[in-house]
Design a protein with these regions (language model features):
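Charge-rich, low-complexity N-terminal segments
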Residues: 1-106
């Protein structure tokens, strides 16, 4: 496993821990995966939210907590530079769920 992939996995793991601890209990925020730019200056954390109607609120919450999340990652990950974090809804997972629903209903 290359360095970039290890860092992405660790960011995913720590983000999931942080969001489950800090999140409200009205929705479930799942960290689907994380990606880092080749220069390791930016990372995007992809999340899914249940129930779906809480998605916008959960995304806003996660984006507000980016600074705290970055500090948590910095404290728990042994690398010199922590990438700037962005958070987005995992559209691939969302599309997969729509396809599954369409297949069930046909």
């Amino acid at each position: 496993m290359e360095r970039n992939e290890k860092i992405e996995n660790k960011i995913k793991e720590l983000s999931a821990e942080f969001l489950s601890r800090e999140g409200n209990k009205t929705s479930l925020i799942n960290v689907a995966h994380a990606t880092c730019s080749p220069d390791m200056k930016r990372a995007t954390i992809y999340i899914t939210v249940l129930p779906i109607d809480k998605e916008k609120t959960a995304l806003e919450f996660a984006k507000r907590k980016r600074g705290e999340l970055r500090g948590f990652i910095k404290k728990n990950m042994p690398v010199k530079i922590i990438p700037f974090l962005d958070i987005a809804i995992d559209l691939g997972e969302k599309n997969r769920q729509k396809i599954d629903e369409l297949l069930r209903n046909s």
